[in-house]
């Protein structure tokens, strides 16, 4: 049968085994990312936001002095903290996915590249 260009049974079995292992590892990674708390802060550190490794918002902390500086200042600080947390969270996710896939370029949505 190998003469017809079909893979031998051993290769096919190995491919399925690897696919199952990647699926199990991906599930474990998903759980690890869900459990992570990644902090991002404004430049002055008066606004902080925590996201999971899957970019789910977890909590926000604002220094009381920030609230006395007006809405525009507070909003800018919160946005900066959110951007920082998002960048760190997506970088962590991308790094962990590369570890999982052994550096294969799978061109996954949301993973940039």
Curated annotation (Swiss-Prot):
Q: Superkingdom of the source?
A: Bacteria
Q: Which GO terms describe its cellular component?
A: bacterial nucleoid; cytosol
GO molecular function term, any single one:
DNA binding
The compartments listed are:
Cytoplasm, Nucleoid
- Record keywords: Cytoplasm, DNA-binding
- InterPro entries in alphabetical order: YbaB-like_sf, YbaB/EbfC
Q: What is its main location?
A: cytoplasm
Task: Provide the family line.
Answer: Belongs to the YbaB/EbfC family.
User: How does this chain assemble?
Assistant: Homodimer.
Q: Briefly, what is this protein's role?
A: Binds to DNA and alters its conformation. May be involved in regulation of gene expression, nucleoid organization and DNA protection.
Q: Per its record, how is this protein called by name?
A: Nucleoid-associated protein SynWH7803_0026
**Species in which this protein is naturally found:** Synechococcus sp. (strain WH7803)
């Amino acid at each position: 049968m190998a003469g017809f260009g079909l893979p031998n049974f051993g290769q096919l079995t190995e491919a399925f085994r690897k696919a199952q292992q990647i699926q199990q590892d991906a599930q474990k990674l998903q759980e690890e990312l869900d459990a992570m708390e990644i902090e991002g802060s404004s430049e002055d550190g008066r606004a902080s936001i925590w996201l999971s490794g899957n970019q789910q918002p977890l909590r926000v902390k604002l220094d009381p002095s920030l609230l006395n500086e007006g809405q525009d200042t507070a909003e800018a600080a919160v946005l900066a903290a959110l951007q920082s947390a998002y960048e760190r969270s997506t970088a962590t996710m991308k790094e962990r996915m590369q570890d999982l896939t052994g550096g294969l370029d799978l061109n996954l949505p949301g993973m940039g590249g």
